[in-house]
Amino acid sequence: MVKIRLKRVGKKFNVIYKIVVADSRAPRDGRFIEEVGNYNPHSKSLNLKKEAIISWLNQGVKPSDTVKRLLTREKVWEEFTSLKNNKN
């Protein structure tokens, strides 16, 4: 199963997360299919490739709980659900 989740990078006590599409069986910091954004929890900055994320969500990829919360904060999740409802 493929998921959108966080990959931890950076130094100790100075963590940055990459938002990646990865197989759920792969290790947290292991192989991934595509990088679709990054998140810095210290400065609360979030950069997303919205088109790529919506494309993956349309293919049936499930986000982790934390990624879903970040997508909701940036209004990407609402955009995806509205596109999905308009399609049906």
Curated annotation (Swiss-Prot):
The protein depicted here goes by the name Small ribosomal subunit protein bS16
One Gene Ontology molecular-function label: structural constituent of ribosome
Biological processes per GO annotation:
translation
What's this protein's family per the entry?
Answer: Belongs to the bacterial ribosomal protein bS16 family.
Tell me what gene encodes this: rpsP
**HAMAP family in the record, alphabetically?**
Ribosomal_bS16 (MF_00385)
Q: Does the keyword Protein biosynthesis apply?
A: no
Task: Tell me the PROSITE patterns matching this sequence.
Answer: RIBOSOMAL_S16
Instruction: Tell me the keywords, alphabetical order.
Output: Ribonucleoprotein, Ribosomal protein
Gene3D superfamilies with a match to the protein in the record: 3.30.1320.10
Q: Which Pfam families match?
A: Ribosomal_S16
May I have one GO cellular component term? small ribosomal subunit
